[in-house]
């Protein structure tokens, strides 16, 4: 698979992380309200540094940058399984940027990248069952709900096992829209 380092949408640039992104990454990764629906966090400063060190895989993990300001507002990624021609997409945005369509925009670009550039046949995503914002992002991008994984992961903020809603889209479904 030939990975791209940078992807662009109308309002966003998805680019590799740098260590200079520390403050932005820690602003969402270290905020309990922001990571409530995640299986990780809230991060300590050391955990955020480790995250940034791990995020230098071209074409898989991206910093989400507003074109208008150059500000890093989140992270996203696509994680291919080349053996099965499938991939999983995920994202997190700083809560100050929720409900502005950025999630839908970046997820749409990750899905496009997966099908058109990486040649995947199926893309999945999942979210905490109570994370209605992520449901909407997936559904707006043509993904359909496939099921519910009961007590799928430990939510560190709420300190409880959380169900996960599983979504997917096939290449033929993507191409038909």
Range-by-range predicted roles:
Residues 54-57, 116:
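Secondary-structure boundary motif
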Residues 33-54:
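Conserved GNAT-fold acetyl-CoA-binding loop/helix
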Residues 1-35, 61, 65-177:
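Acyl-donor (CoA/ACP) binding surface of acyl/acetyltransferases
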């Amino acid at each position: 698979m030939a990975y791209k380092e940078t992807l662009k949408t109308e309002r966003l640039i998805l680019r590799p992380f740098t260590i200079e992104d520390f403050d932005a990454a820690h602003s969402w990764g270290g905020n309990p309200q922001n990571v409530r629906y995640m299986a990780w966090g809230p991060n300590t400063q050391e955990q955020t540094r480790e995250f940034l060190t791990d995020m230098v895989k071209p074409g898989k993990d991206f910093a989400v940058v507003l074109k208008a300001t150059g500000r890093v507002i989140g992270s996203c990624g696509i994680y291919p399984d080349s053996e099965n021609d499938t991939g999983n997409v995920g994202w997190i945005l700083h809560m100050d940027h929720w409900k502005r369509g950025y999630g839908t925009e970046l997820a749409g670009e990750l899905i496009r990248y997966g099908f058109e550039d990486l040649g995947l046949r199926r893309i999945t995503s999942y979210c905490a069952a109570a994370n209605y914002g992520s449901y909407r992002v997936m559904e707006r991008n043509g993904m359909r709900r496939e099921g519910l994984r009961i007590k799928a992961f430990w939510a560190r903020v709420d300190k409880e096992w959380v169900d996960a809603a599983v979504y997917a889209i096939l290449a033929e479904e993507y191409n038909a829209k």
